[in-house]
Structures are given as structure tokens and as C-alpha cells.
Amino acid sequence: MKLEASCGTATSEVPKPEKKTARDAEPSSETRPQEVEAEPRSGSGPEAEAEPLDFVVATEREFEEVLAISGGIYGGLDYLPSRYHSWLRDPDRTVVLAKRNGGVIALESVNVIDAGETVLVEGLRVAPWERGKGVAGLLQRFCSQLVKRQHPGVKVARLTRDDQLGPRELKKYRLITKQGILLVRFNASALLAGLGARLAALRTSGTFSPLPTEAVSEAGGDVARLLLSPSVQRDVLPGGTIIQDWQPYRPSESNLRLLAAKGLEWRVDSRARPRVLTLCTRPFPIPHGGDGTWRYLNIDAFGSDGAQVQSQLLWHLQRQAPRLVGLNVMCQLFLEPQLWSQLADFCQVGLGLELVKGYTEQYLLEADI
């Protein structure tokens, strides 16, 4: 089903295709910064107006075309090849494509969360040959109007970005919170082979000794008790928000059900008096290297105790590495900005991981809709 749009004005409904009611067992989404054109440079762009765009609900048939417009995105860390099919099966999500002359030139996903009050904007990307023509602005405007019609209870739009915010973004969006981003890489087999000796050396030098950590069970209700606690929301969660692999959730019963379907692994310093909480998203393949040997591992850390973040990071690496033997891993750790240097040193000097790039930040933005 499609809509002709010569000026980016949505004038009729785009029905959502029937979807399976059961959620996919894999994590169904990953939020990322807006790709390339968060805003058109001027209005809708003269070239975008010259040739009408068709906005259509994405299907399995367009998968290869979506890959074709996504080459090189996020430096080989693109999640979409691993998420596209499960996105289409997500009953709370609509993936919209912009087409010109029958070919896919742009994509954006809108995902309704927070019990229907928030739309999460994800995955915006425009084909390299179409950038600078206002396509992104037209697609964003259409998706916003679509959400308003299909979900009248939605109050705000949220998105995450990792690029520097300019005056235009700060005027349009409220900054809810920010986290530091630490990106490292390693070979899982090599990490396992040398980890024992490295930890022994750290203990001997008095540099680091793992602190006790505790499991957090979703089935036993530990996750709900922690995340629905006012003190955890106030003192531990950044901006009172659970940010899971770039995707922000308000702490609520409905969102905890969404998170429970993703197979996350949680850790905390103390269930009785929590100060640091971490969660690890299941690793998935990424295009980096082009040989199928790379996986992406995402760990979100909440709290400001550096030694405890180190201990929980180590626990997650020890947990995941045996499952990734023979593979290379890009690991992104999100943490309090003031802890970045401490954790970067721990990862490089202590654990022998390779730092991929310097300090960057993840921004959580919000705007009324």
C-alpha cells in the first residue's frame, strides 16, 4: 500500500500489514543515531519536489534494496541486516520506505512504546545518491503524521544520537540525558586464552580485584523490583530511563514485558542496595570486515561506581566470550561520562582489548508530537 507525496504532505492512511502477535525471541530493535540527514537542508528540497515519492510499508521483498542503500553505515556496525525481519514482525512497529520510480531510497522505523505514549524513531537512512535533496525531511514528516493518525495517544517522540548536537537540534528537541560511549574490539578466543594471566597480574599489582556482583532474575521478579524502585530511577538510571542498546524505555510494567522478550542478561552490585546496574544484549552479526566473523556486543551500565562497573563488565565478558569462540567482537559499553577514561584504561591495559575510537557520547532526545 502506498501514498503519493509530492510535497511531503500525508493525505491518506497507510494501513499496517497483518503481523504475528508473538514477539520474536531475538531482540527486535536497536536504536541508533539518525543517519546522515536528520533534517532537510531547506524545506522539502527542490529535487524531492520535482519527482514524487511513494511511501510504503516495508515488506520482506525490499530487504536487498534496503541493504543496498545502507552500505558503510555506522562504520560496519549496522544493526539493520540482523534486525530487519524481526522489525517487520513487531506488532508495535511500522517500518516505512520512501521509493522513487519504484526503487527504495530511504527508510525510517517508528516504534510505539511506553504504553502507547511514546514513539521511538529509529533507523533513518537515505541512499547516498539521494542525500541533500530533502528526502529525510519528507519521510520524517510522513511518519509523524502516520503515528498521529494510527496512535492518537502518543504524546512525545524520542530518539538517540551519537553526533554532536547543533543549535537546530537543541531548539527542536529536549536533551533528556547523555552517556559516554566506549568502543573496543577483541577476538573472543584470544581474550579467553589470556584472561586468567591478566587478572592474576591485576590482583598482584593491586590494580584491580573483581568486586562481588549479583544476578538479577526477570523470572523471579528481581528486574521489576529494581527498575520500578523510585530510588533506582532517581539515583541509578540516567534521566530515569532504561537505555537498552540505544533504545530508551521509561520504567513501567508494559516496558518490562517488552524487555523480558529480548533475552537480556542483567547484573547488579547489590539487590538490597543497588548502586550499579548493567544489562547485556544478545550478540548479533554485523557487516564489519565483510567475512561474517564479526559480532556486536552491547553492554549498558548505569551508576557511577567505576570499580563496580569494571567488575560487572568483566562478568559479562566472561559470560559471553565462550559463546563467541572463533569470532571477532565489537563491544560497545555505555556508561557515565566521567567513568570513560577509567574504563578505557581498564579495557586496554588490564584486559588487553583494543580501543577503536576515542570518547563519544550518546544523547537521548525528546520532542512533543
Swiss-Prot record:
Name recorded for this polypeptide: Probable N-acetyltransferase 16
Gene3D superfamilies: 3.40.630.30
InterPro entries: Acyl_CoA_acyltransferase (IPR016181), GNAT_dom (IPR000182), Hisat_C (IPR056483)
Function text: Probable N-acetyltransferase. Shows only trace activity toward L-His and no N-acetyltransferase activity toward other amino acids. The physiological substrate of this enzyme is unknown.
Acetylation is among the record's keywords: no
Other notes: NAT16 is the ortholog of the ectothermic vertebrates enzyme HISAT (AC I3J7Q8) responsible for the synthesis of N-acetyl-histidine (NAH). NAT16 protein, unlike fish HISAT, has only trace enzyme activity for NAH synthesis.
Location of the N-acetyltransferase domain: 53-188
PANTHER family, A to Z: LOC100145250 PROTEIN, N-ACETYLTRANSFERASE 16-RELATED
